[in-house]
Amino acid sequence: GADGGTGKGIWQAQLIAYVTAGKTSGFFPLPPQQTGKVLLLAGEDDPGKVLKARLLAAGADMNRVLVLTADDYFGKTGQPLTLKDQALADFAAKAGPLLLIVDPLQSFLPADVEMASRNQMRSALLPLRAIAAKQGCAVLIVMHSNKKQGVSGRARLADSSDIWDMARSVLMMGRAKNDGKIYLSHEKNSYARPQQTVLLHIDDVEVEGVKTARAVFDGYTDKKDADFIEERRVRTAETRQDTRSAILNVLSESRLGSMANPQLKSAVLQEIKCSEALTNARMLSLYGMATLQNISCAKRTAREGGLPGWPTVEKHMIQ
């Protein structure tokens, strides 16, 4: 699970390259015991415009990648593709994948399923478990995280904690506050000790004249999702406190006890050496003039702010 735009799909391309072509990297340093096909249910990214270049950049064997999109299925049948549809089981039987990816899960759930309902989610995922058992394949379920602040691990998965319970392994992705690096934290492993957290960044690349992106391995850390979330919370609190203190210091040292917007902004920036903290305070955008009489407003504001196409199974490739 991860927030939108973190890079789930870009890292996922590295996994697909590993499964289809046996491509090793910092992400997957040991050769796989076997390689095979990947069946990708894509609910958001277009195969021709996005996925093909991304997978080529990662080194995937495109002859072993099969993509079924929610939009294309609806265009052909007039019905949304859901996990319970027999069509999905039929596609999987023809493809014989080693790995089945559902990205994201929300795009392939029946409309009447409430993700917060444990019973409904278990029933909705039963057909997927049956496919995995019949085909002998692994399943990767991709989810967006929720918008709750200050939560990590299990609490970050959108709506349904039951998915955490059913999954044998859970990965959480996020972005570090201090240096902006992306992390992939192994939060749960039902069969062994969770592995170290992977650090990565994303490079812009060009493949066959098409601009795309590629995940680049940076190293490992023992920090987990909760550590990064706590770091973000602490740094935000420190930034707000620094901004508040700087505003009060500048105003208290002013000879007139007041200062026009541009002068106050410049003085505060010099005081705290951080324009982002001032922006997050959002105080100056609300008041054209700050005075000592407005200190209570400054305190409150600083406290509240914070400074085309898809491949058929028969073709076994993306067109």
Model segments located where?
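The Walker A/P-loop phosphate-binding site
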Residues: 1-60, 172, 307-318
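Conserved, well-folded catalytic cores of nucleic-acid-processing
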Residues: 18-22, 54-58, 108, 131, ...
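C-terminal regions of RecA-like/P-loop NTPase motor modules
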Residues: 93-96, 134-135, 176-319
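Well-ordered alpha-helical segments embedded in enzymatic catalytic cores
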Residues: 15, 87, 124-127, 246
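Conserved phosphate/pyrophosphate-binding and hydrolysis machinery centered on Walker-type P-loop NTPases
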Residues: 114-118, 157, 237-240, 258
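Conserved inter-motif catalytic segment of the P-loop NTP-binding fold
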Residues: 32-119, 123, 130, 220-224
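Phosphate-binding/switch region of NTP-binding enzymes
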Residues: 5-10, 119-213, 297-301
